[in-house]
């Protein structure tokens, strides 16, 4: 079973993923976890980190199709591992997946036809061309925006922040983008 948790930055996805994994452990179900993007992954991990640090341009200046390719490539590289776990009958829990790509990249375009074209393109690229596994369950953690705002205004620390090398994540730094992403998800 492939379970995906999606949501805005700071929505509590990692907390919920850990609770789901504990539940599986208590039930004796072998489970695996991945967080996307995988900053330690060769090629795509470092490119995504550079993008999120702002080294490739401002959040509204880098073509969302190119950014979508980076995030999709990371998942395509992980697809064989996901299939291996799933084929073995294990539960797989993911913190972000394809719909994060749709949400964040489409939010960079005006609402309407251009967003819809990009949405279709990302879904076709990831599930069609790359053939990555489709989730059995995909949950969007729709928390009040004030919660996200508060979480993103706090200092965020931990090993999972190493990719920033002291910089701010350009997606997290833009509350306007986060609002638009929420609109795309909904």
Roles of regions detected by a PLM:
Residues 13:
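Conserved lysine of the Walker
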Residues 16:
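Hydrophobic positions on the alpha1 helix immediately C-terminal to the Walker A/P-loop
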